[in-house]
């Protein structure tokens, strides 16, 4: 098993991957593969989240950032917290996840557009590997607001 087995796994670079909710074993694999940080955008919601995830991640020697983004109400504050975490962890090997890599692909696409110079088309194509924003009007509006 490895991090590549995480649900909806996407590799952005050697230092950055995204995915859905990892199992405890997949988090152990992440530590063994040299990841130094985990950003979790999924609210604590057992059984869909991993109970004690933060403690496990930290016990494995990785930094843990939890930004619980409500699927039905993503906020500007959520995105600002994500931007701050990404900027703080620049240069680290980071696993970013939520439940199914929906929140993450939206947030990372917006982040990469704003901070890494990705054109709109690249950010859209990145997210579209996992889901279509038009399927979720709240998210479509959130993405449009941050793309303006």
Model-based region annotation:
Residues 1-20, 62:
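Mobile, glycine- and charge-enriched loop segments
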Residues 3-4, 11, 30, 55, ...:
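N-proximal short alpha-helices
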Residues 16, 93-94:
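Structural motif
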Residues 17-88:
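Cysteine-based protein phosphatase catalytic domain of the PTP/DSP
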Residues 20-21, 102, 110:
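Gly/Ser/Thr-rich helix-start
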Residues 26, 106-107:
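Phosphate- and divalent-cation-binding pockets in alpha/beta enzyme and binding domains
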Residues 78, 83-93, 110-148:
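PTP/DSP superfamily signal
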Residues 94-105:
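A phosphate-binding catalytic loop at a beta-strand-loop-alpha-helix junction
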């Amino acid at each position: 098993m490895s991090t590549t087995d995480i649900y909806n796994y996407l590799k952005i670079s050697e230092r950055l991957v995204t995915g859905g909710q990892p199992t405890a074993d997949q988090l152990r694999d992440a530590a063994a593969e040299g990841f130094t940080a985990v950003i979790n955008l999924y609210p604590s919601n057992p059984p869909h989240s991993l109970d004690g995830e933060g403690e496990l991640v930290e016990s494995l020697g990785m930094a843990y950032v939890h930004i619980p983004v409500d699927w039905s109400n993503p906020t500007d504050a959520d995105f600002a917290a994500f931007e701050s975490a990404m900027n703080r962890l620049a240069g680290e090997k980071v696993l970013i996840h939520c439940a199914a890599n929906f929140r993450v692909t939206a947030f990372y696409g917006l982040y990469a557009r704003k901070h890494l110079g990705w054109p709109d088309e690249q950010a859209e194509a990145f997210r579209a590997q996992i889901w279509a924003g038009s399927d979720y009007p709240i998210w479509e509006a959130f993405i449009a607001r941050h793309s303006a």
